[in-house]
Curated annotation (Swiss-Prot):
Site (Discriminates between blocked and unblocked aminoacyl-tRNA) residue list: 9
EC number: 3.1.1.29
Family: Belongs to the PTH family.
Protein name: Peptidyl-tRNA hydrolase
Keyword hit for Mitochondrion: no
Length: 192
């Protein structure tokens, strides 16, 4: 079973912000899938995708706890037999750069840190989407909670759409090695 979690903040005022790139990916993923059932549980909007042949259910999750408390929602849904994939923004990657890694520290991302603390492990997949970094450290909060410029937004949408396509393949074949390789080699400035 896959537990695919997009990190973001609930509310219309956060919808188009850089910090909500995890939700952008899930929104695009949902347009590519059929047979999703929506449920509200565990402080989250949860879409279930049932696989009749495999007798499995995958979950696409939008935590409604706000970014820094995402661990509360994930802990409520997570079971050890699940493959957890967390999609989030990354200030240290250039705009549109994508990276997948398994395990490791939160690298200062408070949403990821909340999940690590809640689960007591860092053993899960992270899909990082670069949003770049503002010029000044004092501007970080306004930057991540701000909307990207038009050209920046186009690059982020290309990256989010590519990740959504790769998640569709992962849902089908569970090939994490290919998933990681494809996303790590993607260049949103070249691929249209």
């Amino acid at each position: 079973m896959l537990l695919i979690v997009g990190l973001g903040n609930p509310g219309i005022e956060y919808e188009k912000t850089r910090h909500n790139i995890g939700w952008w990916v899930l929104d695009l993923l949902r347009t590519k899938l059929t047979g999703l059932n929506l449920r509200l549980l565990c402080y989250s909007r949860v879409y279930e995708l049932k696989h009749e042949l495999k007798k499995e259910v995958d979950f696409i999750v939008y935590p409604l706890t706000y970014m820094n408390n995402s661990g509360k929602a994930v802990k409520c849904l997570y079971e050890p037999r699940m493959d957890l994939v967390v999609i989030h923004d990354d200030l240290d990657l250039t705009v549109g750069k994508t990276r997948v890694r398994f395990g490791g520290s939160s690298a200062g991302h408070k949403g990821v840190s909340s999940i690590i603390d809640a689960l007591g492990t860092d053993s899960f997949w992270r899909v990082k989407v670069g949003i770049g970094r503002p010029f000044s450290k004092q501007e970080v909060i306004n930057y991540v909670l701000g909307e990207p410029q038009k050209n920046e937004k186009e690059v982020l949408i290309r990256a989010a759409d590519y990740i959504a396509d790769q998640l569709c393949l992962l849902i089908t074949d569970r090939n994490f090695s290919r998933f990681q390789q494809n996303i790590n080699s993607f260049n949103s400035n070249e691929n249209n």
